[in-house]
Amino acid sequence: MTTIVSVRRNGQVVIGGDGQVSLGNTVMKGNARKVHRLYNGKVLAGFAGGTADAFTLLERFEAKLQAHQGNLERAAVALAKDWRTDRALRRLEALLAVADEHKSFIITGNGDVVQPEHDLIAIGSGGNFAQSAAIALLENTELDAKSIVEKSLKIAGDICVFTNGNHTIEVLDYSAK
């Protein structure tokens, strides 16, 4: 799997993820890009799970964003409905973390769209480790969102064998608005 972390703080939302692709117990690739900017850079998305499945879902999500003029919540719900009802999509095993300047969501294959507590998302095999680290950093430091994501991914990578140190991090800065 992988680790994807999203933190929102002080006018920024950040999503970061590692680059490891595993096949069983073998590392197949170490520099996969699992975090992307969508909808003219206004939406961030990261995925965990089967890489081919996740790319399929990411493409579908991007199409939903276009269809709903960038409305993140409506696009997330539309994708979740399709994911739940489409026989082919139902077999896909992945999770998506998506965020814009207003909201963040986790989209699951069960058709769930979850708005997380504390504007923090951590998914994938190292998600619990990254979430614990991010909560501690949010509650006990004044670090910015990007630094918290970086440190959380590092900690998760030190513990989880399916998470590496090759990170992709995207920042959406809306503090000037």
From Swiss-Prot:
Pfam families the UniProt entry points to: Proteasome
InterPro entries: ATP-dep_Prtase_HsIV_su, Ntn_hydrolases_N, Proteasome_sua/b, Proteasome_suB-type
Signal peptide limits: none
GO molecular function, one term: threonine-type endopeptidase activity
Keyword Kinase: no
One Gene Ontology biological process: proteolysis involved in protein catabolic process
Cellular component, GO, one term: proteasome core complex
Catalytic center residues: T2
Subcellular localization: Cytoplasm
Enzyme class: hydrolase
UniProt KW keywords: Allosteric enzyme, Cytoplasm, Hydrolase, Metal-binding, Protease, Sodium, Threonine protease
Enzyme Commission number(s): 3.4.25.2
Binding site for Na(+): G157, C160, T163
Record SUPFAM superfamilies: N-terminal nucleophile aminohydrolases (Ntn hydrolases)
Regulation: Allosterically activated by HslU binding.
Primary location recorded for the protein, binned into one broad class: cytoplasm
Catalysed conversion reaction: ATP-dependent cleavage of peptide bonds with broad specificity
Function: Protease subunit of a proteasome-like degradation complex believed to be a general protein degrading machinery.
Subunit structure: A double ring-shaped homohexamer of HslV is capped on each side by a ring-shaped HslU homohexamer. The assembly of the HslU/HslV complex is dependent on binding of ATP.
Family the UniProt entry places it in: Belongs to the peptidase T1B family. HslV subfamily.
Name under which the protein is recorded: ATP-dependent protease subunit HslV
Organism: Aeromonas hydrophila subsp. hydrophila (strain ATCC 7966 / DSM 30187 / BCRC 13018 / CCUG 14551 / JCM 1027 / KCTC 2358 / NCIMB 9240 / NCTC 8049)
Gene: hslV
